[in-house]
Amino acid sequence: MSETRAVLRGVRLSVDKGRLVADLIRGKKVDQALNILTFTQKKAAVIIKKVLESAIANAEHNDGADIDELKVKTIFVEQGTTLKRFTARAKGRGNRISKPTCHVYVTVGN
């Protein structure tokens, strides 16, 4: 069977925090991965769970795959653009605030 993927780009999440959760489900069966993500108390877990559910729906709808046989083939989180903001400081100065984004890629297959 071919592999099916889902992508979410520009997520307001740092890469390190996303990779921490992605490492938990890499190579696992889909139902086990969803269970892990449901009980992981991280913001990244909610985001990655939505992408995984999208990949499962894509596999079922587009390829007619059996959900019970699907595994998380690959999952990786890459760095996106960093939003740069400024905050006011004393004596007319300003400090930069970096708001990192990332891209989440999930591939499921047999």
Swiss-Prot record:
InterPro entries per UniProt: Ribosomal_uL22, Ribosomal_uL22_bac/chlpt-type, Ribosomal_uL22_bac/org-type, Ribosomal_uL22_CS, Ribosomal_uL22_sf
Gene Ontology molecular function: rRNA binding; structural constituent of ribosome
Keyword check for Hydrolase: no
Cellular component GO terms held in the UniProt record: cytosolic large ribosomal subunit
Record bears the keyword Ribosomal protein: yes
Classification via Gene3D superfamilies: Ribosomal protein L22/L17 (3.90.470.10)
Pfam family, one: Ribosomal_L22
CDD domains documented for this protein: Ribosomal_L22
GO biological process per UniProt: translation
Complex formation: Part of the 50S ribosomal subunit.
Family the entry assigns: Belongs to the universal ribosomal protein uL22 family.
Purpose of the protein: This protein binds specifically to 23S rRNA; its binding is stimulated by other ribosomal proteins, e.g. L4, L17, and L20. It is important during the early stages of 50S assembly. It makes multiple contacts with different domains of the 23S rRNA in the assembled 50S subunit and ribosome. The globular domain of the protein is located near the polypeptide exit tunnel on the outside of the subunit, while an extended beta-hairpin is found that lines the wall of the exit tunnel in the center of the 70S ribosome.
Protein name as catalogued: Large ribosomal subunit protein uL22
Organism: Delftia acidovorans (strain DSM 14801 / SPH-1)
